[in-house]
Amino acid sequence: MEDLMTSYSFTEKKRIRKDFGKQRSILEVPFLLAIQVDSYREFLQENVDPAKRTDHGLHAALKSVFPIASYSGNAALEYVGYKLGEPVFDERECRQRGMSYGAPLRVTVRLVIYDRESSTKAIKYVKEQEVYLGEIPLMTENGTFIVNGTERVIVSQLHRSPGVFFDHDRGKTHSSGKLLYSARIIPYRGSWLDFEFDPKDALFTRIDRRRKLPVSILLRALGYSNEEMLAEFFEINTFHINPDEGVQLELVPERLRGETLGFDLADGDKVIVEAGKRITARHIKQLEASGIAALAVPDDYIVGRILSHDVVDASTGELLAQANDEITDEQLQAFRKAGVDAVGTLWVNDLDRGPYLSNTLRIDPTKTQLEALVEIYRMMRPGEPPTKDAAQNLFHNLFFTFERYDLSAVGRMKFNRRVGRKETTGEAVLYDSKYFGERNDEESKRLVAAHGDSSDILDVIKVLTEIRNGRGVVDDIDHLGNRRVRSVGEMAENVFRVGLVRVERAVKERLSMAESEGLTPQELINAKPVAAAIKEFFGSSQLSQFMDQNNPLSEVTHKRRVSALGPGGLTRERAGFEVRDVHPTHYGRVCTIETPEGPNIGLINSLAVYARTNQYGFLETPYRKVVDGKVYDEVEFLSAIEENEYVIAQANALTDAKGTLTEQFVPCRFQGESLLKPPAEVHFMDVSPMQTVSIAAALVPFLEHDDANRALMGANMQRQAVPTLRAQKPLVGTGIERAVARDSGVTVNARRGGEIVQIDAARIVVKVNEEEIVGATDAGVDIYNLVKYTRSNQNTCINQRPLVQVGDVIARGDVLADGPSTDIGELALGQNMLIAFMPWNGYNFEDSILLSERVVEEDRYTTIHIEELTCVARDTKLGPEEISADIPNVSEQALNRLDESGVVYIGAEVRAGDIMVGKVTPKGESQLTPEEKLLRAIFGEKASDVKDSSLRVPPGMDGTVIDVQVFTRDGIEKDKRARQIEESEIKRVKKDFDDQFRILEAAIYMRLRSQIVGKVVNGGAGLKKGDVITDAFLDGLKKADWFALRMKDEDASEAIERAQKQIQAHEKEFERRFADKRGKITAGDDLAPGVLKMVKVFLAVKRRIQPGDKMAGRHGNKGVVSNVVPVEDMPYMASGETVDIVLNPLGVPSRMNIGQILEVHLGWAAKGLGRKIQAMMEAQAAVADLRKFLDDIYNHDDTNVANRVDLSQFSDEELLRLARNLTDGVPMATPVFDGATEAEIKRMLELADLPSSGQTQLYDGRTGEAFDRHTTVGYMHYLKLNHLVDDKMHARSTGPYSLVTQQPLGGKAQFGGQRFGEMEVWALEAYGAAYTLQEMLTVKSDDVQGRNQMYKNIVDGEHEMVAGMPESFNVLVKEIRSLAINMELEDN
């Protein structure tokens, strides 16, 4: 028993979830961002000793491209190693300045120049040098990249694994519906090679999907003759020709199966098969038993059979017949005449030995290897004149050289497995013993020595003909054994290699010059192509996405996403149903629930909770070992290919206390089917019930009671929840909340254990435990700076709040501070609301939601959004734009929020249309009248030559300015505001460093004190020899004088010396860091070309919940707020408590998401238990009673050993703190597929003194009358989604117009109008509202003259309109004229 008890950390002791899971946890939830972090770590191999780096990532890419030799071969550039420098700016600075977070890559290369004169290639001279190859983006510890100041995520790609695949066309190609089989060799990079049958059973090949050629052309190009091809693919029957008549067949009985002979088959006198009868398996057994070796057959038996070899007249050398000819009567007579003794024929039949290659040879026009090579050249390069060399080089470069073709380790492994070879390693190119055997370069000799007489291409064709012959099966391309995951590291490596290959071409050109001109490696290598390739990938690849940062869950999910789209993947339009569908191999690897609705459904998936990738990139999932019906805790990860061979039981299979499977038949999965098997046949068992789903789906309680479509919506909508002002843990969770919050990186976790010594809103200081301190310079202090009110990618607010107090003792990994949407280290996306399921005056018709005013008053769903507004001053043709408070034609009142530099104050409350940054732009001189010129000469009025282009608050937005940043171009004088900001920033940094130094110093002195108090001195600091140091003496001594003490004890004097060194080292380090920071702050900023100054203003916008906002539960039960009703009108219970939200009960039955009802029941029980605990606390019950009640809640069910809570670990003080944290409700965990049962929910309700039906009598708040029947009431975790009505409301009177049609633009972003479409026109036509219609189609839309005239008329007070010609009609006329049809308008 005891070993099951977990010890609780400091954070967990604050609040413990009651867990209903029956399954003991075998495997902890793994680090959720591992797929990103591990992949990129392997790519960089940053902290690995250069000599020990493996063939991955940067190292592999550099090794594959270098050495680069010049065309003459007299100079070469070799790769030695690489190292990454330090990033110039840290993550925070990059975000602020809009930079990319990366480190410079420096590669050491060696230029070797050989002596031309010597025959042995003697080295003339060698130069080694470090070359800068651009910036490599670095990954933050949360798995993201910062590109141009924004956080991005590189999504992993699920693509078809390299290797060989066999398939058929499902009868679609030919009208007869005949299945045409095909094979395709897909390399990691290089040309695809296809083999396919046509309806006439000839075999063709295609290279890169071009036009098809008979497959024999490819084999002939490899060097095979007709006879060799036939010998490879067919077994041969030998016939001996009798001189007069008849033929003797060398009998292999098996080969006669299915034939019908025209003569009796006899063994002596005993007839085995009568003439005209079909030969069966029984007959063959008899023949084998009889031991007949030869069979005499008539001539007509051999006629029509296909020759396997050329037949030559031995005496004259005349060719009598060629291989692959069908034997005719005449030829047979000629053989007899020439005295040919024996001929070989191909063993073919219609059943399972098709004559496919023989058919193909008949349509092959080529005769020699050269002709075949030329044919391939013509197909690949139509229109170019072929030469022998060109044809040979082209063919060689297609499949046989590593520069152009790479199967990769995965591809080779898959290839060898599919064609039935034992070994999984081999060459990256296609190997063919005949082809390489005829070449005599070094590489070919090495290959032949290594692989002997195998042939990749022949093996594929053999497997394909076997499949066509009915032996073997085609592959399922949606099987996860045939699709692999390409993660960040691998994609970055490919991009880096592409950049290097571009560099290689340029280097080759220059190397020939290097010999004569003595160039250095730095002059040879131009890093631009590499840097450009990397920048393009991280900045604009389809898989480099703007991180979804609504809340911690959406961040984690985005990083765990697996997409089938992207370069080298599928496209939405072409992806069929099969690719998108759930496949049995998805089990435990890819979530079967979470995928977007819409055009991407099934193409974008999410990794399952426990899934990981193996070394080849295939997804694997963990299973527990089962041996002879006994389940062990040993865990093994299986890929989809390996899993195929095993029988796997479900996680909830019944076992006894010893772990033996108890049922007679266990429900299992085997090869994609579900069946029942006896325990002895089971090999593995699932690790956990939530193995099949992703994190988002695993966060939905009672998922097992929801319909899959709704569960999908629930999982997707949790990612859109906006972090509320105060996060609230879900009363009903699934127990995985803590893991998600921990791995998302939004909380602050302790790096090392220790004691909290100082804390404020922005910083936590930990004095580290002695045993965790490493190294002499480590002062044993950890300082955590918290993130305060910063903007996320989705404009939500990121803010961290400390959870600990001074004096708390914490361990490594404890949560020190909560981030957005976390509550004591648990994910908390919404609020627990009291919900009633009942109709309420139609206000909850069609999923509408009725809210109580109390929800708004208590700010339960108030969220803070941070908007970033940017004002840019550019250099224009007419002169520079200027940021200033001196703006023409603007009232004083409009400028009252600006300082003298023209920038808004921090703390100003602004509304739509207010000026935030004053800016004027010079405008072109208009022609002035002499009077104006005179006036301007007299009054010197300058206002007329600039126009106001200030940054104003956009419509529909109001808020408080929380931060202003001013960026100034290098070499331009900073204005007063910029200098102010700079000074305050330097002050802040200085104070920060001073504080940090003070804390470190105090910690060092404190450690020193413990090491020297009570020790004897030799003198110094006013002490005599033999005195003992006391605490009181040290208190009276200046800190600097401590180091003057001379100790008797060796250790103590060493401690003093060490402390002094530490303080000096830290002081130096802080000075250096401060100087570095200061330099960065005061330096000019790197702005885009033409930009002189940039001001960023950050607005905090408070959004309360209001009608029109979208809300949802976790079960796909979404809706829009329809009304906010005063508290006194809401339904209330007998106790007087009013409900917060009223939902429509009709939303449940048809949608089949019953999970929400169970959640409401259990939530109510959780809240009731909290109230009982509160009542006990208020009554000051004895701690023992409280302990007993908590034990009753957590450990009532003795059978559920898996999740007992050991309350004996808690001291009385800790228990009281736990109880205080539970007064708001006892949080419950019901893990997916292993959740609370109906009986358990009822027991909890009873324990909380609530009706076990989960229903209660409600009263109408307006009349006070009781409703007719009892209502389901309880607590549900309800979310506010990031679809807020404030972001969608939009109106326009005048605004921008489209350039060509002159019609108003559309959409809020463009400040567009509302489209008056076809159907709306019909509606006005139907009403006969001709004038309204004319106005809509002309002056309100695209009649330019009419628009302007209308404007003038309104200004003049005349309300009349003159409709003219709509511009779009003019466009139509012009388009018709462009088709050379003249169309003119006549006045009627």
Curated annotation (Swiss-Prot):
Its biological purpose is as follows: DNA-dependent RNA polymerase catalyzes the transcription of DNA into RNA using the four ribonucleoside triphosphates as substrates.
Q: How does it assemble?
A: The RNAP catalytic core consists of 2 alpha, 1 beta, 1 beta' and 1 omega subunit. When a sigma factor is associated with the core the holoenzyme is formed, which can initiate transcription.
Q: Which GO terms describe its biological process?
A: DNA-templated transcription
In the record, the note on similarity to other proteins reads: Belongs to the RNA polymerase beta chain family.
Recorded GO cellular component terms are: DNA-directed RNA polymerase complex
Q: Which UniProt keywords apply?
A: DNA-directed RNA polymerase, Nucleotidyltransferase, Transcription, Transferase
**Gene3D superfamilies under this entry?**
2.40.50.100, 2.40.50.150, 3.90.1100.10, 6.10.140.1670, DNA-directed RNA polymerase, subunit 2, domain 6, RNA polymerase alpha subunit dimerisation domain, RNA polymerase Rpb2, domain 2
- EC number(s) per entry: 2.7.7.6
UniProt name for this protein? DNA-directed RNA polymerase subunit beta
CDD domains reported for this sequence: RNA_pol_B_RPB2
State if Ion transport is listed as a keyword. no
